[in-house]
């Protein structure tokens, strides 16, 4: 008998637990779910809902789930960044799905925002530096609070912006700051 899908909801739960995810954790998820194969539910909404449900089930009510919602395509444009409406750019369908959840919060950064849900999501994403990776940034809060990076279907060199935070803090000679001016619309 040929199976018509590669994995199930139970497989998602088992896999997340196998890599060490557990209750009350805060996690930062970068993903390309297309790399995982065919899911038992054939709809895009079913796939996204179940991955988010699995993550929520594992981290529980005291955990937090964060995703990248960067919109780097706004750099050097006249487009206005809107906290609620501006979509992420090339960050994956799970990121966009989480961004659109009613209970999600997004950091106010026009180019490198992060979105999250959970008991402390607002704390992590509010009152951050205007420099995307410097002291006072989301990344500093992630480091200070042991947020776990989870890469799904993405090579680590494309999925760990935390490295840029470390490079900025340490002051490596090959990084430099480049300022961009961007109009920001709705901030609520």
Name each region found by the language model.
Residues 1-188:
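N-terminal and secondary-structure boundary signal
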């Amino acid at each position: 008998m040929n199976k018509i899908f590669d994995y199930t909801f139970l497989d998602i739960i088992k896999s997340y637990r196998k890599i060490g995810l557990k209750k009350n954790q805060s996690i930062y998820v970068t993903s390309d779910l297309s790399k995982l194969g065919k899911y038992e539910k054939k709809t895009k909404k079913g796939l996204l809902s179940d991955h988010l449900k699995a993550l929520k089930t594992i981290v529980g009510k005291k955990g937090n789930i964060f995703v990248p919602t960067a919109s780097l395509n706004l750099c050097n444009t006249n487009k206005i960044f809107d906290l609620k409406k501006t979509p992420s750019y090339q960050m994956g369908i799970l990121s966009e799905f989480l961004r659109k959840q009613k209970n999600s919060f997004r950091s106010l950064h026009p180019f490198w925002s992060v979105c999250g849900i959970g008991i402390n999501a607002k704390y992590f994403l509010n009152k951050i530096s205007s420099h995307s990776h410097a002291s006072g940034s989301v990344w500093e809060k992630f480091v200070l609070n042991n947020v776990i990076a989870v890469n799904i279907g993405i090579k680590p060199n494309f999925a760990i912006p935390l490295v840029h935070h470390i490079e900025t803090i340490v002051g490596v000679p090959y990084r430099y700051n480049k300022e961009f001016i961007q109009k920001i619309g709705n901030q609520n």
